[in-house]
Amino acid sequence: MMDHFLNTIAFYFYMFALLTTLVRVFQPKLTHWVPLGFTAIGAALQFAAFLIRWSHLNWAPVTTMYEILCYVSFGLGLAVFFTYRKFDAPVLAAMSLILPIAALGTALFTESPDLKPVVPGLQSRWMPIHVSCWCFSYSAFGVGFVVASCLIALRRLGRAPKMQEELGDLFHRLVLFGFPFHTLGLITGALWAANAWASPWFNDPKEWTSAITWLIYAIYLHLHRKKILGADWLGIVGMASVLLTFVGVNFIPSARQSAHTYVSPGSPGWLMLGWILGPFAVLSIALWALKFWRKTPVSRLKQDREVLNATR
C-alpha cells in the first residue's frame, strides 16, 4: 500500500532528523535547518500518505489505531518543526523528536495498515474536525511536556536563568496554542455525539479524562496569569492526563465498547502501557543525571574538559 510505504519512509526521515540533531549537540556549527529539513520532509510524506488513504476510504482515515498513530505522529512532526524553527535548542529538539518517532514506529511495527470499513457512528462531518483539534492540541502539549521537563530540571539545578525564562515563555506559548484546539475538540466532540447518537455526553471514561485534561491546562493558564511559581509542573501532570486519555482508558473494560477507543484487539498490552510509563521513565533518568551533575564541582568539570582538549 502506497500510504504505508510513505509513512515508512517518513519514519526514517524522522530518524535522520534525530541523528543530525544529536550531532548538533556536539557540533553546534551544523545548521539547525538540516534536522528541520528532514522533519519537514517526514511530515510532508505523512500528509501525502494521509490524502492517499483518504482517497481509498472516501473518508478521513482516523478511525483505527494505525491511522490515529500516523495522524498523531504527523501532528507531532509539525509541532517539532514549528517549535524549533526559531528556538534553536538541539537537546530539546532531540527529546521532542522521540515523540513522533515513537508514535509512528508503534503504528508501523505493531498495528495493521489494512483498510477497514467505517462504522456508521463515525461517519459524521464533525468527527474529522474533532480528531484534528484533538491531534493538534495533544501535539502541542507533547512538545510542551519536554520543554516543561527541562525547565523544571534547570530550576532544580539553579542554572541558566535566562534559558529558564525562554523555556517558560516557550511552554506558555505551546499551551496557548494547544488549549483552544482542545476546547474546540470538546465542543466538536459533543456536536458529533449529538449528531450521531442524539446525546452530547455519554458518561464515557474518555470523555471524563479529556475534560480533566482541559481543566489541568485551564488551571495552568490561571496560575501563570497570577505569576505563581511552579505552574509549569502542570505540564507534566497534563501530559499524564493526555496519555491516560489516549491509552490508559483502553484498559478499562467499560471503555472498550466506546467509539473513542482506538486500541486494536491484537495490540500488545505491554506496548500500550509503555506509552504511559515511557516518558516518565525518561524524565526520571534525566532528573537523576542532572542531580548527579549538580553534585560534581564545576571546577572538576572544567578541569576534565581541559584535559580532554589537551589530549586531542
Stretches found by the model and what they are:
Residues 115-120, 161:
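Low-complexity, intrinsically disordered or weakly predicted helical/coil tracts enriched
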Residues 121-132:
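Acidic/Ser/Thr-rich, low-complexity mid-to-C-terminal regulatory regions of eukaryotic proteins
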Residues 158-165:
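Cytosolic, membrane-interface loops and tails of multi-pass inner-membrane proteins
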Residues 3-117, 132-154, 166-196, 202-312:
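Hydrophobic cores of alpha-helical transmembrane segments in multi-pass integral membrane proteins
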